[in-house]
Amino acid sequence: MKKNILKILKKNKIKDEEENIIVDSLEFIRLIVDLEESYKIKFDDEDLIFENFSSINRIIEIIKKRKLLNYKNYLNQKIKVKVDRKLGDKHPEYEYIYSLNYGYIPNTKSEDGEEIDVYILGEFDPLEEFEGVCRAIIYRVDDIENKLIVTAEDKKYSIDQIKALVEFQERFFKTEIIMEK
């Protein structure tokens, strides 16, 4: 494992001139857990020093909570969504069908290095694109990705309704739903 990670570091040249490891994904930080050495890691323009990897989960949780603040900026805002998994599509890796339209906000970046993911509620036809209002955040406590809930301007859902509608995928994660009051 250690050799593989070091190969990735060298291959992708993600060390700066001071030999700090520079990452843009919390997932990559998780890969470094098994290294026995101490490393200074730069994430989101902040230095993180790992000398004892037993505390990495706590540090990742702190980073995630800080990142959650960025998601809160989307609450009650109009958002344009590009749909990449339409209502009725099969998940590309797992054996379930999307019971709603699912996509992303173009030109954004989430913790996994991809665009910010979005569930679209209340639309009952497969869509290519959608413009709506962000009503909630699905905060995945045990994963690096969070999701946004977007609806048409005239539609609102309770926390229980949101949980039921996204259960097909979110049942695999420990989540909290965050909404403005």
Where are these regions (language model features)?
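Phosphopantetheinylated carrier protein domains
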Residues: 29-52
